Amino acid sequence: FYRETAQKGRRYINISEAVIDVYKTPYKDRNVERDRVQIYKGRKLLSEKASDTLAVKLLGGPNLSVYVDVVKNPDLLLDPNILPYYAFRMEESVMLNDRPHYVISFQPQAILPYALYYGKLYIDKERLSFSRAEFALSMDDRNKATEAILRKKPFGLRFKPVEVAFLVTYNERD
């Protein structure tokens, strides 16, 4: 499932939702370039007010689901060069889908020229495999967060991201 929203003040001016099928190549390849996304069913709700129409281009869309796979695309969070910039902490174990899981929370512990993430990783205790990743772009420095997601905007437009969050779930398939 994919959802993306944009607000102007307290009103939603754009809501995009879709049920998507993600076609993944084997994880041993560690390459997201050949993964594909197909929209099974979708809808988009746009504000009809002319003043709500923005010529803003953001990082996003259904294809983003391929790139936020932290296992297949470790550059996002699990790259050995990036790990020292995070503080990791073991949380209390939880049950997900009737299976025990380790929970590892992480948050930035360094100030870099770009925004980092914070969140939780869920690891199946028996299989020692990822089952879920919940993470969000740190808004500690809104300018860095804006640079991370904003691709194009009209001159003079003030743009302030409120939240950029991801939930990635992993299911075992034969």
Language-model features: where?
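Gly/Pro-enriched, hydrophobic low-complexity segments
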Residues: 75-77, 89-91, 101-174
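Surface-exposed, low-complexity/disordered segments
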Residues: 1-85, 97-100, 150, 154-174
